[in-house]
Amino acid sequence: NIQFDNDKTSKVLGHLQVFGTPTVAPYWLMPFDTISTNSWIYPGLTNIYRVHTSGASTTHTDLTRENVVLTGTIDPTASTAVVGVGTAFSTELIVGDSILVSGETRVVASITDNTNLAVTVAFSDVANDTSPERVPGNYSATAAGGWNGGVLGGIAILNNGVDAPQFMGTANDAKMAALTNWDRTKTCAVMRPFKRFLVALDTTESATRYPFRVRWSHPAEGGTVPVSWNDADATKDTGYVDLSQSSGFVIDCLPLGDINVVYKEDSIWSMAFEGG
């Protein structure tokens, strides 16, 4: 092996393990700085970790998403029908989510409105829960799909094509969470930052795959995630295009100066922001 240093080429004399043994087998690697540490994020198939060193000490931290407290209260009865008080089921949950109510976990089968849903298995007639939770659980990444992402204005973005894209800020105790303002009924094979935008490629929307699709968010302010992906909102700089002029699917994109280079299986496209 060789290395490049000060415009010279030299032989690599060897290598040395720096960060110790990973907690999980890494399927991707991304440098990321928190407020006080320089670290590397490495996701496995089911969990995400970061590693950093301080002197002779190496620390591996689990960043896997945690339970999310839901709005309102739920007083379950011995029924699959669930009625909430002050809840926001329509915006905080989707079919297939797991919810934890008074110590019992159930899967959402259908959502009628903000205060009514059904679960696949009836709850017991247990106590009223003033802080019910959505239980996202571990990730479902595949070895074939792996992970991708990047850093948008100081925010870590990770995506595996199966779960909702994840984000994390720079606080030392931050954990991953589902990307705010992204419709969790959608997935994308790849998500990358470009300037102040996030770009999603090869999306699946309402269970239909769009392998030629390139979808972009509204531009984000520094240290925040995009406030919208709604292409129907004329007040936002969101949108999408289907690069279906050839049969190749979109597979990735990476910034090159002021353009975003979009790679298909059989062609390469350039993407640029031309707003005012």
Language-model features and meaning:
Residues 1-68, 133-276:
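Recognizes the extracellular SEMA beta-propeller fold with strongest preference
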Residues 63-93, 98-146:
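Small/polar beta-strand repeat architecture
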